[in-house]
């Protein structure tokens, strides 16, 4: 796949519902993620190899393609929804339980529980004010939803996705996350420890992925930090003095629209943005635990296996030392001057 200058990647495959002016500009090159029918044998090969692909015709969430804000407001029920509120367009995830390790950490967004109607009011109020404040609903679908949503959910193409899961010996479906965002919202680059089918329902999202072997280009926060698994690099204003390897980053990108399903492999970094001036976006994630570790390990290890090892080392050291802040100095003492230059 040829490298491109980001937005220009889409000239040939442009969907009439959006154009390049709606994409944010970044400094790194990107390649196109293949767009294929789910019946195309190449799609199966990509998923088997844990490489991303956009599937255009799975009908995975077909009954949900009618979902919009009024329909959901009428039918989603009276449960509580997790809504993140941020001062700008970037919603950097953080683990509230890990905040105890970093007393000085100040989250860039806050999470509030509210009814769906309260979220809609808050979103419309924010849109009308035109200020910097933004909201993003991120809620696991649960049994508080109304009957019509349940009927839609049961009508998803479970036959197809269950076969995908079985073929690859993945673990169970852990959750279906409903995401409703304002135009221009950004979820900065991070990776998950689960397999993900990312089903777009309303509006368009640009998804930029990076393979696990670009770990050293993306500088994740330490495992004990609240922003574990998130990149420290600000894509809009990268600090190359602090993060010099980011100059070597190469992304894989696609814009997904209603009915598209993007396979995001486990441990692949992904940066997700709702298009500028593209209206509200609705997405449902299908998250699966990965396949169990094979009894016989094959060498050389794959990049994602090395990421898992690094995570385990950080976790073990944090527990052994009794203080996560001692992990970095100990690793530096171990490596500096010993492993960081060629040994004869």
UniProtKB/Swiss-Prot annotation:
Binding-site residues for Fe cation, renumbered to this chain: 190, 192, 270
UniProt protein name: Hypoxia-inducible factor 1-alpha inhibitor
Binding annotation for 2-oxoglutarate: 136, 187, 196, 205, 285
Record's PROSITE patterns?
Answer: JMJC
Catalysed reaction, written as an equation:
L-asparaginyl-[hypoxia-inducible factor alpha subunit] + 2-oxoglutarate + O2 = (3S)-3-hydroxy-L-asparaginyl-[hypoxia-inducible factor alpha subunit] + succinate + CO2; L-histidyl-[ankyrin-repeat domain protein] + 2-oxoglutarate + O2 = (3S)-3-hydroxy-L-histidyl-[ankyrin-repeat domain protein] + succinate + CO2; L-asparaginyl-[ankyrin-repeat domain protein] + 2-oxoglutarate + O2 = (3S)-3-hydroxy-L-asparaginyl-[ankyrin-repeat domain protein] + succinate + CO2; L-aspartyl-[ankyrin-repeat domain protein] + 2-oxoglutarate + O2 = (3S)-3-hydroxy-L-aspartyl-[ankyrin-repeat domain protein] + succinate + CO2
Root EC class = oxidoreductase
Q: Name one GO cellular component term.
A: cytoplasm
Q: Which InterPro entries match?
A: Cupin_8 (IPR041667), FIH-1_dom_II (IPR027452), JmjC_dom (IPR003347), RmlC-like_jellyroll (IPR014710)
The record, for SUPFAM superfamilies, names: Clavaminate synthase-like
Instruction: Tell me the subunit arrangement.
Output: Homodimer; homodimerization is essential for catalytic activity.
**Which cofactor is recorded for it?**
Fe(2+)
Q: Where in the cell is it found?
A: Nucleus; Cytoplasm; Cytoplasm, Perinuclear region
- Please list the GO biological process terms of this entry: negative regulation of Notch signaling pathway; negative regulation of vasculature development; regulation of vascular endothelial growth factor receptor signaling pathway
Q: In this protein, which residues make up the domain named JmjC?
A: 133-303
The record's section on PANTHER family has: HYPOXIA-INDUCIBLE FACTOR 1 ALPHA INHIBITOR-RELATED, HYPOXIA-INDUCIBLE FACTOR 1-ALPHA INHIBITOR
Q: Which domain of life is it from?
A: Eukaryota
Q: Modified residue N-acetylalanine is at which positions?
A: 2
Q: Does the keyword Cytoplasm apply?
A: yes
Any idea which UniProt keywords this protein has? Acetylation, Cytoplasm, Dioxygenase, Iron, Metal-binding, Nucleus, Oxidoreductase, Transcription, Transcription regulation
Which residues make up the binding site for substrate?
Answer: 143, 173-174, 192-194, 229-230, 291, 312
Q: What job does this protein perform?
A: Hydroxylates a specific Asn residue in the C-terminal transactivation domain (CAD) of HIF-1 alpha. The hydroxylation prevents interaction of HIF-1 with transcriptional coactivators. Also hydroxylates specific Asn, Asp and His residues within ankyrin repeat domain-containing proteins.
Gene name per UniProt: hif1an
Q: Name one GO molecular function term.
A: peptidyl-histidine dioxygenase activity
Q: Which organism is it from?
A: Danio rerio (Zebrafish)
Q: What is its EC number?
A: 1.14.11.30, 1.14.11.n4
- Important for dimer formation, annotated site positions: 331
């Amino acid at each position: 796949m040829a490298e491109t200058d980001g937005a220009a990647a889409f000239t040939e495959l442009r969907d009439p519902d959006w154009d390049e002016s709606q994409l944010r500009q970044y400094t790194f090159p990107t390649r196109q993620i293949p767009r294929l029918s789910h019946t195309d044998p190449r799609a199966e090969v990509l998923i088997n190899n844990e490489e991303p692909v956009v599937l255009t015709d799975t009908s995975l969430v077909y009954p949900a393609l009618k979902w919009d804000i009024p329909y959901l407001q009428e039918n989603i029920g009276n449960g509580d929804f997790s809504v993140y509120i941020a001062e700008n367009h970037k919603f950097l995830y953080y683990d509230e339980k890990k905040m105890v390790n970093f007393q000085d950490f100040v989250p860039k967004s806050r999470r509030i529980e509210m009814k769906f109607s309260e979220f809609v009011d808050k979103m419309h109020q924010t849109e009308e004010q035109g200020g910097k404040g933004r909201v993003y609903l991120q809620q696991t679908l649960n049994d508080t939803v109304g009957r019509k949503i349940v009927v839609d959910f049961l009508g998803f193409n479970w036959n197809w996705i269950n076969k995908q899961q079985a073929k690859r010996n993945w673990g169970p479906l852990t959750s279906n996350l409903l995401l409703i965002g304002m135009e221009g919202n950004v979820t900065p680059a991070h990776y998950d420890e689960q397999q993900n089918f990312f089903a777009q329902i309303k509006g368009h999202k640009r998804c930029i992925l990076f393979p696990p072997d670009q770990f050293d280009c993306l500088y994740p926060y330490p495992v004990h930090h609240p922003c574990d698994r998130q990149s420290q690099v600000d894509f809009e204003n990268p600090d190359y003095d602090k993060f010099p390897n980011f100059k070597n980053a190469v992304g894989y990108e696609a814009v997904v629209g209603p009915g598209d399903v993007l396979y995001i492999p486990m441990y692949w970094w992904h940066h997700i943005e709702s298009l500028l001036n593209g209206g509200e976006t609705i997405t449902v994630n299908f998250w699966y635990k990965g396949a169990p570790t094979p009894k016989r390990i094959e060498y050389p290890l794959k990049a994602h296996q090395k990421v898992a090892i690094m995570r385990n080392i950080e976790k073990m050291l944090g527990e052994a030392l009794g203080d996560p802040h001692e992990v970095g100095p100990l690793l530096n003492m171990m490596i500096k001057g010993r492993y960081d230059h060629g040994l004869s």
